[in-house]
């Protein structure tokens, strides 16, 4: 039986990958995370499988390299997903984003170099090339050969992207030395149930629940291609199983929509009948983002199947049910994600 390790398996994407492997692959799965995403220290998806003899869960701070010692050294597949992420984090504590993400990367690379693992997938982001689109007008949809650009190295917004650029280079160049095989996946606006609160779709739910009127649409003409979690998970697993060593793959969807279209769709689902008004978005937010996924389709046979309308509806329904349950539970929705009301 093959063995998989998910570094950062307590997060949104990591916990869904864990579920996929346990239900769709004959793998033993180890998960290691500091579980900081949840104030309770628990991840509902993982709790479902806690009694499985194919799953082991480790709670550890991997900025301390000695905490890798509790792991095996011979995994067939390693998913490196751990990172400090979020617009709130890069704006509030950019120095911590740099410190934590850099240490996670370097500790993981050094542990892998001393181990005998097979293939590694490193999770990157479309943020790595966001500056290129704005500064140089590269084509949208955008493929993997786009140069990576940081418009202002001093701006806190780019700290996350800079650490992901470091990770892409680090994993590819360690793989080039023969320590392991590595592929990189760049995620593009992954969303779905239980994604947390600091994302555009659950944030829209919260705002509509407050009956804001007029409802402000921030960056109404900006466009994104949203990638449902089930498709992102499958793309990631296919990348580590089938991807070419030292290659980068864009994992996303090619259906580009405007923020206005998304907002009005969510409003309709939530029976909003008030007015809308346009408002400026956050500084540094790119005007368009949509991946060219031709390479992933050809190499991985990756084909996202969940249309955005279907995925958004499923996500909204999940949040409505969760919020309804949180009203009577001791731990509120906000408490779970450590959010100050």
Regions found by a protein language model. Name each.
Residues 1-190, 306, 322, 332, ...:
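N-terminal Rossmann-like NAD(P)+-binding domain of SDR-like oxidoreductases, especially those catalyzing
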Residues 12, 85, 195, 257-258, ...:
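Short alpha-helical
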Residues 37, 63, 97, 192, ...:
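Glycine-/small-residue-rich active-site loops that bind phosphorylated ligands and cofactors
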Residues 47, 69, 109, 172, ...:
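Solvent-exposed, non-membrane alpha-helical residues enriched in polar/charged side chains
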Residues 133-144, 165, 169-240, 254-256, ...:
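NAD(P)-dependent short-chain dehydrogenase/reductase
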């Amino acid at each position: 039986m093959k063995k998989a390790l998910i570094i950062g398996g307590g997060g949104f994407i990591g916990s869904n990958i864990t579920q996929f492997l346990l239900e769709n692959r004959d793998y033993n799965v180890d998960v290691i995370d500091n579980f900081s995403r949840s104030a309770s220290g628990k991840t509902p998806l993982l709790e479902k499988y806690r009694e499985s003899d194919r799953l082991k869960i480790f709670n550890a701070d991997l900025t301390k390299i000695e905490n890798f010692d509790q792991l095996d050294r011979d995994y067939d597949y390693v998913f490196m997903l751990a990172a400090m992420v979020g617009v709130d984090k890069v704006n509030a504590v950019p120095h911590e984003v740099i410190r934590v993400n850099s240490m996670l990367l370097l500790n993981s690379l050094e542990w892998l170099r001393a181990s005998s693992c097979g293939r590694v997938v490193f999770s990157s982001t479309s943020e790595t090339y966001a500056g290129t689109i704005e500064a140089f007008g590269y084509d949208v949809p955008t493929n993997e050969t786009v140069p990576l650009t940081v418009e202002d190295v001093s701006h806190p917004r780019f700290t996350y992207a800079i650490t992901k650029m470091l990770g892409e280079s680090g994993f590819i160049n360690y793989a080039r030395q023969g320590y392991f095989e590595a592929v990189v996946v760049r995620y593009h606006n992954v969303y779905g149930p239980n994604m947390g609160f600091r994302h555009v779709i659950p944030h829209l739910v919260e705002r509509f629940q407050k009956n804001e009127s007029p409802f402000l649409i921030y960056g109404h003409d900006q466009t994104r291609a949203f990638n449902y979690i089930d498709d992102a998970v499958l793309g990631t697993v296919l990348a580590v199983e089938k991807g070419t060593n030292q290659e980068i793959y864009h994992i996303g969807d090619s259906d580009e929509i405007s923020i206005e279209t998304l907002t009005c769709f969510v409003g309709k689902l939530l029976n909003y009948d008030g007015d809308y008004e346009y408002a400026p978005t956050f500084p540094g937010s790119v005007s368009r983002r949509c991946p060219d996924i031709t390479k992933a389709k050809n190499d991985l046979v990756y084909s996202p199947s969940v249309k955005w309308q279907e995925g958004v509806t499923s996500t909204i329904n999940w949040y409505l049910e969760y919020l309804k349950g949180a009203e009577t539970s001791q731990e509120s929705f906000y408490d779970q994600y450590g959010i100050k009301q």
